[in-house]
């Protein structure tokens, strides 16, 4: 039992040691960093850094300065020097004692002109060159019309306080715009004053969508037809009929109306499948002349020739023309 307890306590001890090792390492690293920072604080006056003279500084060493703080101190110095007009920055007197080689040059060496105005003039010049010809000549024609003064938005170089260099750049940009406006002349004024919508209304007055004839439908042959339709020459005919006269049956090839379906006789009124040249013959009759009696007895029903269901004792008609009519 004791061996088992000792074996189970060994991994727990290892876990505790592993958990305490990072804390020990962190403490040792922190002590080393503190010593290094103290050494740097005592050695800073030897590197040329300004320090307040007196025996009290050696007794009470100043806290160490991180090298990153030097870079951060340089950035506000660079940003605050152009914005400040001779006023000391908020960093104090220690910031003013930086060597001039590390920061910007002194204020006396700056040019007398304002750099922001020069940059604005250069940007205006580039914008004038990048404009398309259509927009540039319209704006210049309106701005440089003969007998018209300067625009209210513009001002002279003397009023804005521009330097001679900036005024020369402004005059150069204006001279570049002059030939474009002079080449157009009065046409540029007309186009700038009147938009192209007036031309559209002149071409198609009172028709905003370009409808030339609203009474006629799109693609129609007449005002009463449907979309893209043509009037039929024979509206009474049936679909697929080749016959000219109306009222004939479907697929009839006879020249005369009223014939039976599939009849190949030239005269109407013949029975179905009759091959005789004259109408009124009996069904299946192969005689050339009509009116010949049938060989069947009188009581038998006769096929279609003159009639179908003929009762017994009914006299046979003498002529087929009377029955056909």
UniProtKB/Swiss-Prot annotation:
Expressed in skin and tonsils. Its main location: secreted. Residues 41-60 have a biased composition (Polar residues). One of its GO terms (cellular component) is extracellular matrix. The keyword RNA-binding does not apply. Residues 41-110, 147-189 are annotated as: Disordered. Residues 147-157 have a biased composition (Low complexity). Residues 1-26 form the signal peptide. One of its GO terms (biological process) is extracellular matrix organization. It is found in: Secreted, Extracellular space, Extracellular matrix. The keyword Chloroplast does not apply. Keywords: Extracellular matrix, Secreted, Signal. Binds to numerous extracellular matrix proteins. This is Uncharacterized protein C6orf15. It comes from Homo sapiens (Human). The lineage of its organism: Eukaryota, Metazoa, Chordata, Craniata, Vertebrata.
